[in-house]
Regions:
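Extreme N-terminal starter segment of soluble prokaryotic enzymes
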Residues: 1-3
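N-terminal beta1-alpha1 ligand-phosphate binding loop
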Residues: 5-23
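Glycine-/small-residue-rich active-site loops that bind phosphorylated ligands and cofactors
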Residues: 11-12, 44, 137
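Glycine-rich nucleotide/cofactor/substrate-binding loop typically near the N-terminus or early
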Residues: 25-99
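Anion-binding (especially nucleotide phosphate/pyrophosphate-binding) glycine-rich loop
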Residues: 72-133
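Residue-level detector of conserved catalytic or cofactor/ligand-binding positions
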Residues: 138-142
Length: 142
């Protein structure tokens, strides 16, 4: 028996890779001889950079930027090749970085995303893809 697991992350809780690990463990418990394959997926929000890096065997570039509340925030973007990079706004300016009560567009910033872009340009990347899912620009009033 063969299984293919391709799940997006669960917002703010489990990554696509972790979900695949858990599903593989569960499948192996029920079907010890099964073959499990997984593919990281994402919808343009958190986890997008990791999914793309996994697919193309890219590498993470870590940095610290100004977070959504103007405090230092550790994040990363991805190197696809010498000219191309990928990043997600959620890493520097995303909803997962804020509690429900902190989600106030009058008090938050996306400045850190600009810092990620500047860092990528300083590293020589000229083709930069930016995933905007789960970013602060998606805050809406009920």
């Amino acid at each position: 028996m063969k299984f293919l697991f391709a799940s997006d992350s669960f917002k703010g809780t489990l990554s696509s890779a972790r979900i695949a690990e858990l599903l593989t463990t569960a499948a192996k418990e029920s079907f010890p001889d099964c073959i499990c394959t997984s593919v990281e997926t994402a919808d343009g929000g958190e986890g997008t950079t990791d999914a793309v890096l996994c697919a193309v065997k890219g590498e993470r570039i870590p940095l610290t930027v100004c977070g959504p509340l103007w405090k230092p925030t550790d994040c990363f973007y991805g190197k696809l090749d010498e000219n191309r990079a990928i990043m997600e706004m959620a890493a520097a300016s995303g909803l997962p970085l804020l509690s429900e009560t902190e989600r106030n567009p009058a008090k938050t910033t996306t400045y850190g995303t600009g810092e990620m872009i500047r860092d990528a340009l300083n590293h020589g990347f000229r083709d930069i893809s930016i995933a905007i899912g789960l970013s602060l620009i998606h805050i809406s009033e009920p």
